[in-house]
């Protein structure tokens, strides 16, 4: 009779765990996306009202892009388990971050004689005319 009570207990507990999972995980996700879309709508309305206020100025004849095409993708409902990662508006060029000045550093560090330089000519740190330390003096 012990085995029968365990199976009866398991049949009662498993649906309760599934119900708790639904309330804790599945229900908050659409609520979060609805909150994000309402914030996006509010920002869009603020931008459109600012654009309407600026249209009274003399620069009203300039053609401005419609905000509706930018807002369409942002207001789509996407069900995910995490927050959206903000992406920068301007892409970062990785080539600019890399330092590829090997030729310049070699030219600065060594003089024509292959000796390591400690300073430029005419500076206060100058050791002699060639820019390298002479160990004989």
From Swiss-Prot:
Chief location bin: secreted
Q: For this protein, what is any one GO molecular function term?
A: neuropeptide hormone activity
In the record, which positions carry Sulfotyrosine? 113, 130
Q: Where is the signal peptide?
A: 1-31
Q: What's a GO cellular component annotated to this UniProt protein? A: extracellular region
PROSITE patterns xref list: GASTRIN (PS00259)
Which residues comprise the propeptide? 32-74, 85-107
What InterPro entries does this protein's entry cite? Gastrin/cholecystokinin_CS, Sulfakinin
Asked whether the keyword Signal is assigned, the reply is: yes
Cell compartments where the protein resides: Secreted
Phenylalanine amide-modified residues are 81, 118, 135
**Single GO biological process annotation from the record:** larval locomotory behavior
For this UniProt record, the keywords arranged alphabetically read as follows: Amidation, Cleavage on pair of basic residues, Hormone, Neuropeptide, Secreted, Signal, Sulfation
Q: Which family does it belong to?
A: Belongs to the gastrin/cholecystokinin family.
Q: What does this protein do?
A: Drosulfakinin-0 (DSK 0) plays diverse biological roles including regulating gut muscle contraction in adults but not in larvae.
What protein name applies here? Drosulfakinins
